[in-house]
Amino acid sequence: EIVIQHISAAEAVELVRQAKKKSTKIHAEATPHHFTLTEDAVMEHGTMAKMNPPLRTEADRQAIIRGLQDGTIDLIATDHAPHADYEKAKPLTEAPSGIIGLETSLALGNEALVDTGELTMMQLLTCMTINPAKLYRLDAGYLAENGPADLVLFDPAKEWVPERFYSKSQNSPFLGQKLKGKVEYTICKGKVIFEA
């Protein structure tokens, strides 16, 4: 199996699309920040929007969405990359690349893909849970009697503004931005480990 990670350019989406016609062992992954933001976010958020691969154009963002729609991109991953405040306070050329993404990922997918009609909620969840679990042969990504009780309870209509993250790091362009869709509970192995 080959996984092309962090797809960010229209050309990459097309290359993967062509490769998948020749092999069923090719998978591609995109991040929520690459299907929600463009390079303009760097002007607004500075180092908080510096990542690798970098944010690109609106045409690239739309190509990623089309790739998710047609199955060219079959995985969504957060690319959660925490950095200390002092690291992200450096000038843009010196600051490390990467943002945190775990706590905003489901809300961003909900808002940018489901609410806009680009994907159904089931398609979003398939890319975020079912497909990764199958690819990496994990006993996860499904609900069944006697199966692992690992899940979140999510309110897709609830609006919230992340003022602070539970992650030790706060490097996110979504800090202080209103998002739609809130995780209310996280359950791991049948135990509530997070409650909003």
Predicted regions and their residues:
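A short acidic, glycine-rich active-site loop
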Residues: A49-A59, P96-I100, P173-L179
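Short, glycine-/Ser/Thr-/acidic-enriched flexible segments
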Residues: A9, H33, A81-H83, K158-E159, ...
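Glycine/Thr-rich phosphate-binding loops of Rossmann-like dinucleotide-binding domains
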Residues: A12-V13, T36, A84-Y86, P162, ...
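Short, flexible, glycine/charge-rich loop motifs used to bind or transfer phosphoryl groups or to couple energy/partner
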Residues: I64-R66, G141-Y142, G176
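C-terminal cap of metal-dependent C-N hydrolases
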Residues: P91-E94, P148-E195
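Residue-level signal for inorganic ion chemistry
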Residues: I2, E29, D79, G109, ...
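His/Asp/Glu-enriched, well-ordered alpha-helical/loop segment
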Residues: M48, Q69-D70, L75-I76, A81-A157
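Histidine/acidic residue-rich metal-binding segments in metalloenzymes
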Residues: E1-I76
